[in-house]
Structures are given as structure tokens and as C-alpha cells.
Amino acid sequence: MQETLRGQKTTNNFKIQKVNWQNIKVSADNTHFLFEGKQIFEKDFIGVLKFHTPGIAPVFDNTGAYHINIKGEAIYSERYTRTFGYYCNRAAVVLNEKWFHINELGKQVYHNSFLWAGNYQENLCTVRDANNQYLHIDLDGHKIYSETFTYAGDFKDGIACVKTASGFYKHIDTQGNYLNNIEFLDLGIFHKNFATAKDKVGWHHIDKHGSGLYNERYAAIEPFYNGFALVTQFDNQKVIIDERGQKIIMV
């Protein structure tokens, strides 16, 4: 059920009868919130970020950083150095240079802290530990595999990109197993079964076996969008290709 706000007055006496949090926008200067172009909550903040499910937004004022509901009320009494949006009912926060996640009551959900923490995706989150190594944790802050990496990105559809100690990029699953045995100089996430990858010749698209979809290499590429992708040749000419690598049009 969407949380709604009834009878809330704005600074210009505009009354909101019913508000879906998804329709609350951030002002251009990132200091307050707007509904239908008009300010709500009768308050300016030092900084705000947009609302996320289930209708909670990170804000910062002279008391510190915290989260508010769609009535503009703080949802807990704690204050942090910095707060971010809720994902999977967890929000990344910073307190005295320590990064960790809190629940919707503002309480830390695990005992350890990190040098950096991302946002939970698919109930898993990438973090950077005290040795500046990246890994993924579950909702309770537990490592989901034993290895650490030079870098680790978010999971999408159960697959994440990591940079190994060898300096190459690979894909892993949620158990930390490599998706295939092929290493790349750079790597993107899978989108509709294909990922962007860079080898010593250039960029191309690969499948989950790490095999290239075509022989051509490019200076830059984008993920496939409904069967087609924008790529940049080494002469800087941009081209639309299909999933077989066939050049369709110059753009």
C-alpha cells in the first residue's frame, strides 16, 4: 500500500489531499521537496535526495543527516554524517567516517563497519573493507564468499563484475564462483543476456560463456537496447549494430 499524506499544507497554503511518494520531486537546488511544482513540508534543508520505497527520503540539516517520511517527519531520532536511500529495507549511512547500513528504525543492522558501502541490490551489497578490498555482504552483513577483490560492482540478475588481484575483470555469481574462465581488461554488467567487454583489441559484446558475439572490436560500445547497440569505431564514427554484429546504420 502506498503511504499517503492528507491535509498537509505547503508554504504557499496549497493543500495536498493525497500524495503518492513517487510524485514528490526534489527541487532544482536540492534543498526541498515539490509536489505538482509546489513546495511541501514548509522546510528547507541543507540537502535532500529523492524518495525511495516505501516512501522515505534522505535529508541533511543543521542537526545532521537522517531520513524523513512523506509527511516530512524524521522516522528516527539518530543523526548521521551522511545518509543514502533505502534499498531492500536497508540504507547506507556514514558516522565518523564509518560506513554501515541501518533499518527503517534507524538502527545499525550488523556490528561491523566499512570504509565504504554501496546500496543493496537483490538483497546483496558491495562494500570496501579495512584493507581497501571489495566484497559482497548479505542483509545481515555477512560475507557471501571467502574471496576479496580489487573492485566489485552491484549484482544484477545474480551476476556481478569484479576486478581480481591479477588486474583483470571477471563475472561472478552469488556464491563467488566465476561465470567463466575468460579475463578481460574491462567489463560491464549483463543486460538482456549480453555484457560489454574489453580485450587487448577493443570493446565488444559477450555472452555468459565469455564468448564474443562477433569478431569486430570498437573504441566504445553501449549495451544492447531491444536488439541493437550504439558503438563507436576507432575513427570515431558511431554505428548501430545488431546482436550478430551487423552494421545497420551510421549515426
Spans of features found by a protein language model:
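Residue-level detector of conserved, function-critical positions
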Residues: 2-251
